[in-house]
A protein has these predicted regions:
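N-terminal beta-strand motif that seeds the catalytic metal site of vicinal oxygen chelate
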Residues: 1-17, 76-78, 125-130
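Vicinal oxygen chelate
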Residues: 8, 30, 38-41, 80, ...
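Core segments of cupin and vicinal oxygen chelate
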Residues: 8-51
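Helix N-cap motif at beta-to-alpha junctions
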Residues: 12-13, 83-85
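Short amphipathic alpha-helices within nucleic acid-binding modules
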Residues: 19, 86-91
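A short, acidic/glycine-rich surface segment
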Residues: 37-39, 61-67
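Short, charged/polar surface micro-motifs in flexible loops or helix N-caps
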Residues: 46-50, 60-62, 85-87
Length: 130
């Protein structure tokens, strides 16, 4: 068993696709519709066959409440690994991203937090060397 797909709820799939591709630098992997349902995923261009992130339209009341609650408490909806959190912070910030936390050293890692403009906080994580 392995993790091949995970998801984040978004309030607007087109807006999310622009943010995750143009600002974060991911590549669109899948985009198709069946009736009112749209299946939309992105993946790292460095690992085109790696884990995909589904940008799922949040049209569920319970999911919306959860999404809003973790956002308000400063909790990330997803975490992405990077080898260079400070470099990615500068690159992504230059593309217009709003960071709620600049690169910060915490136990065994350096993290930064940004707003994906679609209802989520995203954490960038660079693991420390042990």
């Amino acid at each position: 068993m392995k993790i091949k797909l995970t998801s984040v709820y978004v309030d607007d799939q087109d807006k999310a696709l622009r943010f995750y591709t143009e600002v974060l630098g991911f590549a669109k992997k899948a985009d198709f519709s069946q009736g009112p349902f749209r299946w939309l995923t992105v993946a790292s261009p460095e690992e085109s066959d790696g884990t995909e992130l589904q940008l799922a339209l949040n049209d569920n009341a319970a999911a919306k409440a959860y999404q809003q609650a973790i956002f308000q408490q400063g909790q990330p909806a997803a975490m992405f690994y990077t080898d260079d959190v400070k470099g990615d912070y500068e690159r992504i910030k230059a593309r217009g991203a709003e960071f709620t936390m600049p690169p910060t050293d915490v136990t065994a890692s350096t993290i930064a937090m940004l707003n994906d403009t679609c209802g989520n906080l995203i954490q960038l994580t660079q693991l420390g060397r042990h």
